[in-house]
Curated annotation (Swiss-Prot):
Mg(2+) binds at residue 19. One of its GO terms (cellular component) is cytoplasm. It comes from Bacillus cereus (strain AH187). The gene is metK. The keyword Transferase applies. This is S-adenosylmethionine synthase. Binds 2 divalent ions per subunit. Homotetramer; dimer of dimers.
Amino acid sequence: MTKKRHLFTSESVTEGHPDKICDQISDSILDAILSKDANARVACETTVTTGLVLVAGEITTSTYVDIPKIVRETIQGIGYTRAKYGFDAETCAVLTSIDEQSADIAMGVDQALEAREGQMTDAEIEAIGAGDQGLMFGFACNETQELMPLPISLAHKLARRLTEVRKNDTLSYLRPDGKTQVTVEYDENGKPVRVDTIVISTQHHPDVTWEEIDRDLKEHVIKAVVPAELIDGETKFFINPTGRFVIGGPQGDAGLTGRKIIVDTYGGYARHGGGAFSGKDATKVDRSAAYAARYVAKNIVAAGLAEKAEVQLAYAIGVAQPVSISVDTFGTGKVSEDVLVELVRNNFDLRPAGIIKMLDLRRPIYKQTAAYGHFGRTDVDLTWERTDKAAALKEQAGL
């Protein structure tokens, strides 16, 4: 079947978006706990609305952290520092409702089913059972240097740049809430050739004009991020298309942890298992196995075994070994997908304990992932973004 030129769109949001505030609070609490108790079990959910933060969840730990203090410091760091923003780090109410992890769940995580039934060797007995059932996807493609789809890559860079020009006072009239969206045109061979549409909505001071915002964002945000060769005379720009965005953040919309799972991953370009990341320690396969799946997919593409690769992992609660591993290369693979699955099994320990060890996940590294994407990051060193398995995969594949 002949391929046609087509458009694909992805979005991102700034760290001041209500849902992203929640993700950052949840991961800040997780990091604070892990910095004192690496083996803590954390499932921390946050909701924000006008003048209020609620933190709830299940946390089992030997340490103490000051949750209201962490919440206020996180909000202050994002930039909600004045009451007239409708949400302020100093004056917002902070409510907490924290329980311990269910003993029924802990029983499966503490000792994997294989260990309880005597199926594992002594060396494997410490393997952790999956904290839940579920399916997770990882993806990589050769559209960008970081092996991510171009639409989400550009959307994240625009969102990050929006925050940079606000915080460094290049555009001091900007406020923390904002969203970006990028539509990329692909040619008949599935290669990105141009940017068709850019949408940016940003919260701002009430006295600034739309014309000023339009001019400044094109000059200081879009030009600074999007390669000039991708923009042409047909590219469309929608800057604050409603004309005004003064009321924003939690005053404009309530926020919840885990409501930006497509922004967090591949911008809709790859499939998603449905599980969110933020506020969860690494025994939760929603997070750790999604990171592992990205690690696998990225190394497959970096090894030249495929131009794009999507990896699916699936787990049963309390069972260490994944119940399934599959790889889809969308017809771009240099070897069969059966061979790729075998290579994955031979080179990656995809039991929860194996993932935690392989990617060193018991560290306080998570707040930095809670805005601008968990994958394709070039500004921070994330273990699942490394391509240290690529050479071995290539050699074992006989390429």
